[in-house]
Amino acid sequence: MNGGGANITYASRKRRKPVQKTVKPIPAEGIKSNPSKRHRDRLNTELDRLASLLPFPQDVINKLDKLSVLRLSVSYLRAKSFFDVALKSSSADRNGGQDPCRAKFGEGLNLQEGEFLLQALNGFVLVVTVDALVFYASSTIQDYLGFQQSDVIHQSVYELIHTEDRAEFQRQLHWALNPSQCTDPGQGADETHGLPQPVYYNPDQLPPENSSFMERCFICRLRCLLDNSSGFLAMNFQGRLKFLHGQNKKGKDGSLLPPQLALFAIATPLQPPSILEIRTKNFIFRTKHKLDFTPTGCDAKGQIVLGYTEAELCMRGSGYQFIHAADMLYCAESHIRMIKTGESGLAVFRLLTKDNRWAWVQSNARFIYKNGRPDFIIATQRPLTDEEGREHLLKRNTKLPFMFTTGEAVLYEMTSPFPPIMDPLPIRPKSGTCGKDSATKPTPSKDSVHPSSLLSALMQQDESIYLYPPSSNAPFERNFFTESLNECSNWPENVASVAGGSVLKHEQIGQSQEVSPAFSGDQTVLFPDNKNCDLYNIMKNLGVDFEDIKNMQNEEFFGADFSGEVDFRDIDITDEILTYVQDSLNKSPFGSPGYQPQPATALNSSCMVQERLQLGPPQQPPCRSEQATVEPQQQLCQKMEHMQVNSMFANWSANQPVPFSEPQQDLQPYSVFTDFHTADQAFPYTAAMNTMPYTQNFTPCNQTVAPQHSRCTQLDFAMGNFDSSPYPSTSNLEDFVTCLQVPDRQTHGGNPQSAMVAPQTCYAGAVSMYQCQPGPAHTLMGQMQCEPPVPGPEAFLNKFPNGGMLNETYPADLHDINNTVASTHLPPLHHPSEARPFPDLASGRLL
């Protein structure tokens, strides 16, 4: 056994090609010929005649060589001799004195029933003699191992068995499960397979045939050509040992040997097949092709699997028309391999059925020779499930440089020949606009390619075979499309109304136009024919219809969350500081006689002011004539010294602490909007600031102060609809100067000078301002002018902690400020002031 392990051989499909058979003309009379040549010719003629008598299909007979013909002939005669003895004894017992015609009819039924039993059997029948020769194997062995019936009959069974299981198989062939017993010491071991020679017994030495000692059930691994993973398939052998009659074998001395035992077993796969495998294994079919793979015939099972009749299958031309485009080059490679070696090997690909569906098959094709030359192709195909097909597709090793989805045009050295639905880049130019490339390189047609090429077979296929069925069968009616289009066009407006902002509305409209460009435009131009347009085919290929689009848009609409939308008009100060300031203002005890708290409904947030500004153009707030005199009150700045508002004073230079305060002033309240119910209330302006380490230089300025909010918050007004003002807009630090200015129309003898400042342009946009007022009132000061008589630093406040007083001149009363005056004719307001230096005023810095 050790000596045979070095030379292990397994059964394979490789066969010797037969010698070329040519019909020689009969030599004329009188011409001498070679006697050995005549003998060989007569022998070949008899072998051909003998091969035609074998019970095999013609395609199997044509591939047999001389030794195979002789081997199968002997096997057939032995099998016929056995069945003659076995069937004669059994038929005589069963029939008795029955009518011969009736008995013949019963034999026909038995033969037909046996064929059906083989198809229903999950396995194949195997008969092995005691000397390990395959006496019989059913034709269904091809479905499990891939070997033809003619390949294994009268061959050694050890060529099919794994080397590690050969000893076990020989042990099962012995009646006592002990093949080491050797009654004849002259018998040696089998040098070919390393196993001992079989022992022949007389029937008297053996137990009865129906004894339980003769039953066998074991597992063995057999060579399998259909399994690409390991090459072996574990089979379960279940049967019994029986006598093999009618063999007429002789011993070494020439004496006739009695019938010997043989294993009659049914081999079934150890792993039971799935339900789908049981369904597909019975539909192995064969097709006949020309050398260029043009189909010329198909058996009955192939017609059941594919749905074509034999005439329909043969009238379409090249067989590549039935192969999926992604598998054409893969099958062409197998075709070339078959031309070189005579056999294609296993190939898994998709075939087109009559109902335009793709069926996965596992095929093996080989040449059939006639007179030593290839005559036609026989392809054996086994249907596979979709799961098995996809698994083989993933395991497929792509050896070709181009695939269907990447390089067909390069492979065939032509521009893209595929229809728009099959083009990897389906970008088509608009009608009437053609580039230079399209003019110089025309698209190939069916007439410009070779009719027998793969490209021609691909172009002859219908586009619809590569389209998946749509998810819904609802027709694309024009009224349905119009209704869906109207519903889609109304969605952005509804979304904008929910959001309450025009910006969101424009964004939604723009987004809808970008996402659905096919819906923008004339329907009659885009969809002249709903059944033939490219968009319909693409949507049908993706399995999407208008109902699906409607559902997706509804899901996107109802799933939108507008609570997290941030408006660009939101203020920059954080919510915590706003809350702190609002609480401080609400808790501040303002005891001035003219002070009245404004209702909170008008001062909830700056959004109401923004809403009012967006509703219409701004209105000039009318000024009221009544003046409210209030007592000095402590300002909000006393509380702001304990906090920092977004680092407002981070960039200010604190050279020296300067205490300052502000005198009492009489100001006039005003209303921002005439339609507010709180606009008629009077609000004071009082300010007093504690010691703050902030100093700032300032220069004479000229500015028109816009209405200020009452809550010391930064307001960002969207002033897109406002007209630009011809008056300048300066920094926020200069807004504090205007509180000391009075109209120029009043007479003041203290300061005859007047400084003229060139006006600047006020741009319409987002106006941001800070104010320092305790009350929620809106105040508006006219344009005022601050002119120091002597250049240099001047004090802004007149009251300091050291008791120093600054005498300044203020108007006795502020006249009515009429806001109805045109902005281009507003007179400058003049305010005389007297500057006096103080010892504790280090620098003229101003907040």
Curated annotation (Swiss-Prot):
<dbReference type="InterPro" id="IPR033348">
    <property type="entry name" value="AHR_bHLH"/>
</dbReference>
<feature type="short sequence motif" description="Nuclear localization signal 2">
    <location>
        <begin position="37"/>
        <end position="42"/>
    </location>
</feature>
<keyword id="KW-0238">DNA-binding</keyword>
<dbReference type="InterPro" id="IPR013767">
    <property type="entry name" value="PAS_fold"/>
</dbReference>
<dbReference type="InterPro" id="IPR001610">
    <property type="entry name" value="PAC"/>
</dbReference>
<dbReference type="GO" id="GO:0003700">
    <property type="term" value="F:DNA-binding transcription factor activity"/>
</dbReference>
<dbReference type="GO" id="GO:0032922">
    <property type="term" value="P:circadian regulation of gene expression"/>
</dbReference>
<keyword id="KW-0805">Transcription regulation</keyword>
<dbReference type="GO" id="GO:0042803">
    <property type="term" value="F:protein homodimerization activity"/>
</dbReference>
<feature type="domain" description="PAS 2">
    <location>
        <begin position="281"/>
        <end position="336"/>
    </location>
</feature>
<dbReference type="GO" id="GO:0005737">
    <property type="term" value="C:cytoplasm"/>
</dbReference>
<keyword id="KW-0963">Cytoplasm</keyword>
<feature type="region of interest" description="Required for maintaining the overall integrity of the AHR:ARNT heterodimer and its transcriptional activity">
    <location>
        <begin position="50"/>
        <end position="82"/>
    </location>
</feature>
<feature type="domain" description="PAC">
    <location>
        <begin position="346"/>
        <end position="384"/>
    </location>
</feature>
<dbReference type="Pfam" id="PF08447">
    <property type="entry name" value="PAS_3"/>
</dbReference>
<feature type="short sequence motif" description="Nuclear localization signal 1">
    <location>
        <begin position="13"/>
        <end position="16"/>
    </location>
</feature>
<feature type="domain" description="bHLH">
    <location>
        <begin position="27"/>
        <end position="80"/>
    </location>
</feature>
<dbReference type="GO" id="GO:0046982">
    <property type="term" value="F:protein heterodimerization activity"/>
</dbReference>
<dbReference type="InterPro" id="IPR013655">
    <property type="entry name" value="PAS_fold_3"/>
</dbReference>
<keyword id="KW-0539">Nucleus</keyword>
<feature type="region of interest" description="Disordered">
    <location>
        <begin position="1"/>
        <end position="39"/>
    </location>
</feature>
<dbReference type="GO" id="GO:0034753">
    <property type="term" value="C:nuclear aryl hydrocarbon receptor complex"/>
</dbReference>
<dbReference type="Pfam" id="PF00010">
    <property type="entry name" value="HLH"/>
</dbReference>
<dbReference type="InterPro" id="IPR011598">
    <property type="entry name" value="bHLH_dom"/>
</dbReference>
<dbReference type="GO" id="GO:0005634">
    <property type="term" value="C:nucleus"/>
</dbReference>
<dbReference type="GO" id="GO:0045893">
    <property type="term" value="P:positive regulation of DNA-templated transcription"/>
</dbReference>
<keyword id="KW-0010">Activator</keyword>
<dbReference type="InterPro" id="IPR035965">
    <property type="entry name" value="PAS-like_dom_sf"/>
</dbReference>
<dbReference type="GO" id="GO:1990837">
    <property type="term" value="F:sequence-specific double-stranded DNA binding"/>
</dbReference>
<keyword id="KW-0013">ADP-ribosylation</keyword>
<dbReference type="GO" id="GO:0002841">
    <property type="term" value="P:negative regulation of T cell mediated immune response to tumor cell"/>
</dbReference>
<dbReference type="InterPro" id="IPR000014">
    <property type="entry name" value="PAS"/>
</dbReference>
<dbReference type="GO" id="GO:0045892">
    <property type="term" value="P:negative regulation of DNA-templated transcription"/>
</dbReference>
<keyword id="KW-0677">Repeat</keyword>
<feature type="domain" description="PAS 1">
    <location>
        <begin position="120"/>
        <end position="173"/>
    </location>
</feature>
<dbReference type="GO" id="GO:0006805">
    <property type="term" value="P:xenobiotic metabolic process"/>
</dbReference>
<keyword id="KW-0090">Biological rhythms</keyword>
<dbReference type="Pfam" id="PF00989">
    <property type="entry name" value="PAS"/>
</dbReference>
<dbReference type="GO" id="GO:0045944">
    <property type="term" value="P:positive regulation of transcription by RNA polymerase II"/>
</dbReference>
<feature type="compositionally biased region" description="Polar residues">
    <location>
        <begin position="440"/>
        <end position="452"/>
    </location>
</feature>
<protein>
    <recommendedName>
        <fullName>Aryl hydrocarbon receptor</fullName>
    </recommendedName>
</protein>
<dbReference type="GO" id="GO:0009410">
    <property type="term" value="P:response to xenobiotic stimulus"/>
</dbReference>
